[in-house]
Each structure stands twice: as C-alpha cells, then as structure tokens.
Swiss-Prot record:
A motif ('HIGH' region) lies at residues 31-41. A motif ('KMSKS' region) lies at residues 278-282. Pfam families: DALR_2 (PF09190), tRNA-synt_1e (PF01406). It catalyses: tRNA(Cys) + L-cysteine + ATP = L-cysteinyl-tRNA(Cys) + AMP + diphosphate. Keywords: Aminoacyl-tRNA synthetase, ATP-binding, Cytoplasm, Ligase, Metal-binding, Nucleotide-binding, Protein biosynthesis, Zinc. GO terms for molecular function: ATP binding; cysteine-tRNA ligase activity; zinc ion binding. Binds 1 zinc ion per subunit. Belongs to the class-I aminoacyl-tRNA synthetase family. This is Cysteine--tRNA ligase. NCBIfam families: cysS.
Length: 483
C-alpha cells in the first residue's frame, strides 16, 4: 500500500506526496539543552528516527534537520521569564555556552545509546542569528511585525490563518494562559515576540536594527528550517505540546514572510506518563534517561517506545519496561538461532510476514502492528527450526533478510555487529566465545563439586556484565542480554 501519514493540519490520514519526487525534507524541533534528556525526549526522537528510517527504506532520499535550541527559550515557554539556559548557567555559576555544550553532548550520547541516527544537519540557534534577524526585518517590512521599546512582535491580526493548526481561532481567548505572553506594549495580547530586548546584564545578546537583544524561541525554527530545507518543508515533526503556540507561531511567521505553505505534513508525537500520571520536570517525575540506562538496556527502552504508536500516549512503569526487555530478548534469541542455523530441506515463506510489516509501516508508521508481525514471524521461524528437516538455504536467506530489514534497518532494535546481528564482530566474537567457554567449564566443574556459591557467583557477575546463563536438562547455555 502507499504511505499515508496522519497530518495534524488536516486532522486525517493523507497520502504522502513529497514536494519533489523521491526527495523528502524533514525538520524536527530539537531539545533546549539546559538539562539531561528524559523519556519524553526519547519518545519523540526515537519515533521520528523510525520515520526517517522507513522513508529511506522506501527509497526516498531524506534530508533530516533537527535543531539545537541554545538560546531564546524562556522559562514560561512564551514571551516572559528568564532564558532557560541562562538561568541554568546562573544556577551552576558558569557560562551559558558551557551549559549548552555540556548538555548537547549529553543529549547526543543518550540518543546514540538509543540507536537514534544522527540528523543530516543539527543547526544551533546561536549559529544562525543573522538569518533570524533577516527574517524579522522581512516581516517588519511586510507589515507583519512591529517594534516597541526594542522588542519586535508578530502581529497575529495581520495573518488570517493563525490558529489553523491548533484550532484556536478566537484571538481574544488566546491570552497568557495559552502560553503566549501578554504585555501591555503589544498591539494584541496574542502577538508573540520575534526579537527580545536584552535586559542589562543578560548573558546572551546580539546587536540588531532594534538594539541589543536575542531571538524569540519560535523564530529560530523557522529561520533554520527555511535555510536548509527551503520555504516549504515536506514534514515537520515535534511533540504535541508544541502544536500551540510554538508550531502555530512558526506557521504564521514563515507563511507571512514567504507567502507560501510552510509545511505539507505536520506530525506530532504524544506524551509520556509515569504510572498513569503526566510526566514533567515541574511535577518532579521526569524519568532521566541516564538513570534508566543504569538498569535497563537502552535498546530495550527503544523497543518499549516503539511498542506504542507515536500518536498514542506512552505510560512508563518498571513492569512495562521489564515486559519489553523480555520481549526483545526473545527476538534476539530467535535471530541468534537463525544466524547459527545450517541449511536443511524444510520451507518457510517469509513473504506474508514481510508484507504485513510493510503495510503496518506504510499506515502512518504503525510500529506496534509491525512489531506484532515480527513476533508472529519469530514464532513461525522457531517452529520451523524445531523440525528435524529445519529450513533450506533459500528460506534461511529470506528469513535473515526480513529480520535484518525489520529489526536492524527500520526499527533499530538490534545492530548488525552485536548479538542478534548478521555479523558478530569478527575476532572479538571469537574471543568472547573462547572466554565464555572457559567460564562455562569452570562453572560446570563447580556445580559437579556442589560448589554452588562459586557457580552462582560466576552466573551473577556475568549477568551484571550483560550475559545470561540458562540451566536446562540438556546443559547450560549463555546469551547476551544487551548490546
């Protein structure tokens, strides 16, 4: 089936047709780097990572841009309050750029561990001040913006389409409660800041035609997306909490400046809850990824996220993550068994499972249904491999190709060079086998001598290192529990 995407702008699934055949430009709002990444970040960036992976697997040439907000995001997410990075720098008694660079590195490290592919371009807001000033100047000259006391505001009344994404069309009702700051100097309470005058001592400020200041949060994404992807973007993604005001303001300022549609397909991922309660830093229940990774395989966290559709809420609990960890381990064991299998004479048609997987992904990137198809294939594969005649060479090849495409290339829940991969690291894998052979023999001798303390010690230390031992009537076996 052709790819369909739920477009938040039209509030319906729509056939995907990029602006230029065979080429897709996608922009996703990146993090504001003033703290470590949490599970909400993981939900968003894993979801859009799979979108990019599937588009590439489908034959599109994808240019993926994801910004880093290192200035201009105020503490109330609108026009008031202190810059979040400047505030963190003040709290930590250091420079804002040091804060931004430290937490950018932290964010990228977490994304790498989750298997999130790096975007083609990761522009910094501070590296695009001239582009942002030029966009503000263009809006002022076109009559869509005005300056008051060194602040420049976008005039919402000048853009009739304001509210078309969020459905908020009653401008009188769009007050500060909707997170667009109200200032008496604005012509309309709904007007939003494009450029903010820097207060005395402000740590990050630049010269502009309106005096020393810094860009508004909404402005950054418009300027950077248009620079790298053009005036019209195929896909713009982000969390549903950004739909208003952030994305609504992006549309207004971009379309007012260029008189062209800004985005063809708007995609919004849903939010994360913790044990049924909304997650947030203000509620002090934000789940820090680095804390999760101390006890949970990062790829199991990724698998947990993908078991829920990107537009569905994700409820985090220890029980749910444990279930995902166990499920991923079953798939890894099946794949390892598939790698080690030698050709027999039996048959297994992988095509129906491959079709189910592709149809699920073409249906608005439905990863839960795609994963269900992979589990069904895993079950059928194990049944076939249990038979005395096994599987013939062509069936094994087709099965390996399906597992590689689904689990590695598209879902990203396994890697090529780790356990469960099509390649196992060459000499490093041989070395591991040799070491494990010695340890398994030592443990076997300990059990024969009823030295269960030593036997259990070996087992427990290996488990802590990511290797699980299973004792059965046929003997002991081992497998990796993480990459």
């Amino acid at each position: 089936m052709p790819l369909v995407i739920f477009n938040s702008l039209g509030r319906e699934k729509q056939l995907f047709e990029p602006l230029h055949p065979g080429v897709v430009g996608i922009y996703v709002c990146g993090p504001t780097v003033y703290g470590h990444a949490h599970l909400g970040h993981a939900k968003s960036y894993v979801s859009f990572d799979v979108v990019v992976r599937w588009l590439r697997e489908s034959g599109y040439r994808v240019k993926y841009v994801q910004n880093i907000t290192d200035v201009g995001h105020l503490s109330d997410d609108a026009d008031e309050g202190e810059d979040k990075i400047a505030r963190q720098a003040r709290l930590e008694k250091t420079d804002p750029m040091e804060i931004a660079q430290f937490y950018t590195r932290s964010f990228l490290d977490d994304m790498d561990r989750l298997g999130v592919l790096r975007p083609n371009i990761s522009p910094l807001a501070t590296g695009h001040i001239p582009e942002q000033i030029a966009l503000v100047d263009k809006l002022v000259k076109r009559g869509h913006a005005y300056e008051v006391n060194g602040n420049v505001y976008f005039s919402v009344e000048s853009f009739p389409g304001y509210g078309k994404l969020s459905g908020r069309t009653d401008l009188d009702a769009v007050q500060s409660g909707a997170r667009v700051g109200v200032r008496s100097e604005k012509h309309n309470p709904s007007d939003f800041a494009l450029w903010k005058k820097a207060e005395e001592g402000h740590l990050m400020q630049w010269d502009s035609p309106w005096g020393m200041g810094y860009p508004g949060w909404h402005l950054e994404c418009s300027a950077m997306s248009m620079k790298y992807l053009g005036d019209t973007i195929d896909i713009h993604g982000g969390g549903m909490e950004n739909r208003f005001p952030h994305h609504e303001c992006e549309i207004a300022q971009s379309e007012a400046a260029n008189e062209k549609p800004y985005v063809r397909y708007w995609m919004h991922n849903n939010m994360v809850t913790v044990n049924g309660t909304k997650m947030g830093k203000s509620l002090k229940n934000a789940v820090n990824l680095k804390e999760i990774f101390k006890t949970v395989d990062p790829l199991a966290v990724r698998f947990f996220i993908l078991q829920s559709h990107y537009r569905s809420p994700l409820d985090y609990s220890d029980t749910a993550v444990a279930g995902s960890t166990a499920g991923l381990q079953k798939l890894r064991e099946t794949r390892q068994r598939l790698i080690e299998a030698t050709p027999g004479t039996g048959l297994l048609d992988a095509a129906p499972f491959s079709l189910r997987f592709r149809e699920a992904m073409d249906d608005d990137f439905n990863t839960p249904v795609a994963i269900a198809a992979l589990f069904d294939f895993s079950k059928a594969l194990n049944t076939a491999l249990d038979r005395p005649d096994g599987l013939n060479a062509s069936s094994l090849e087709a099965a390996r190709e399906l597992f590689s495409t689904a689990a590695v290339t598209v879902l990203g829940i396994m890697t090529e060079d780790a356990e469960g991969g099509m390649h196992d690291g060459g000499r490093s894998a041989e070395t591991l086998d040799e070491v494990m052979g010695v340890l398994m023999e030592l443990r076997s001798e300990a059990r024969k001598n009823k030295d269960f303390a030593t036997s259990d010690l070996i087992r427990d230390h290996l488990l802590a290192a990511g290797i699980e031992i299973k004792d059965t009537r046929e003997g002991a076996s081992w497998s990796k529990t993480r990459h």
